[in-house]
Amino acid sequence: MVWIVEIGYKKDVTDPVGFLTKKEIEDLGIKGVEEVRSLSTYAIDGNISEEQVKKICEELLADNQIQHYGYRGKNIDKSIKHEHPNAWLIEVGFKPGVMDAVGMSTLNAIEILGVDGVKGVRTRTKYLIIGDVSEEQVKKICQRCLVNPLIHNYSYQKIGGK
């Protein structure tokens, strides 16, 4: 079974990845972006319980002072909700066959934590681009700021708004 875990910064905390991404978008000359929020996403493949997923989140992946987490698995959905009246959600991940160093080190850390049964971990990054941005601009953001086409795949979807 695969558990999807998302780690993001709390609303009242500056998201450093989002902050820098917003600056890069502005450097492209794209106007209308109010805020960028990032989420680190982990696909944890293994025979583990919801309690073990919580342990991984709380003791390894998230800093509970500044971050929050969500997760979903079979018949369980406690994921972070990506709701905003006018935003785009972009997901960036490695292409098949590309080494995921963060995923590999996360797998190793899970083993050290004492959680058995995990076979693999793959990572992705989600970006919530909040503001008045066109689909053409989102493609430009992906291609010029977020994605290396040799190693990454990406997808995007409009959330709410116009």
Language-model features: locations:
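Non-catalytic terminal accessory/regulatory regions of metabolic enzymes
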Residues: 1-162
